[in-house]
Amino acid sequence: MIDTFVIFYKTSNYNTKDVLSLPGVIRELTRKDFDGNLRLCVKPSLFIKKYSSTESSNNKVLCNLKEALLVKDYFDKKIGEIGELRRVDFAYDTEIHFNENQKLNKFFISMLLASRNSSLNKIFFFFSNNTSLNMKIKNKTMEFSIYNCNDKDRLGNTRYEQRFTSLRGLDNFQNKILKSLNKYDKELCDLTSTIPVIETYFSELIYNEYQMSKNKYKNLHEFIAKMDASNFILTKNVFKQFFEKISDGNVDFYIKNFRRKRKDALKFITKLEMETLIKKIRIAIDKTK
């Protein structure tokens, strides 16, 4: 569903203070540039809350495309100009807390990087700080974030947010947004095909770390505990590929023994869990159209 959009107006006649008083406007992100052009950042759901008397909309924090475009029309008429839609933020919220789902989140955003032909070497930089409550990737046309939102007025505790930032032009806003949503949906549909790439990458990442730093650890058990706590052992296959490089032992026996000594350790993400997350986001995309 749609959370936020940014509209660009060339007018310099409208008072910025009047704009800031309009419902749904995000004050801290709305501004005029040196030429007097107005960059208006709006949460359409806040506008809908203001002007709708229905109980369902009083709890509304996201809206569909039709509702968002009606809100844009309101601002166009109020300002007296057809604004250029510069950015639209699509969001899916889940009740699961961010810290409880870090492996799945890391896996998901890694798959997006792979599908967008971005360097997976960015992953180690992004997630080396295990306390981070935000995972983000971006390029010239889009931004994607997974972040903690339990301190905000949201439908859940973790948000998966895709920002479409290449919507410039004064016409066919609906078609442009639909095209972007369909492209994102197609990407999600094909996303699980990147799983082997991600698993190989992380198994090699762990192996290289082991080769460089094994003298820092008392034993293999301690090293694996560190990698597991850092959320690098995403799936059983990641662990298996690494383990078979450094040991002739039985991988299933080792996992069972490791879990016996460390409660809640080596919890692997399954393909079904990933497919379930993807399905839920795709359903949200469909509801947005």
Please report, for each region that a protein language model flagged, where it lies by residue.
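Helix-turn-helix DNA-binding segment
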Residues: 241-263
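Short, solvent-exposed alpha-helical "recognition" segments
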Residues: 257-275
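Structured, helix-rich domain cores that form ligand/interaction pockets
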Residues: 1-246, 269-289
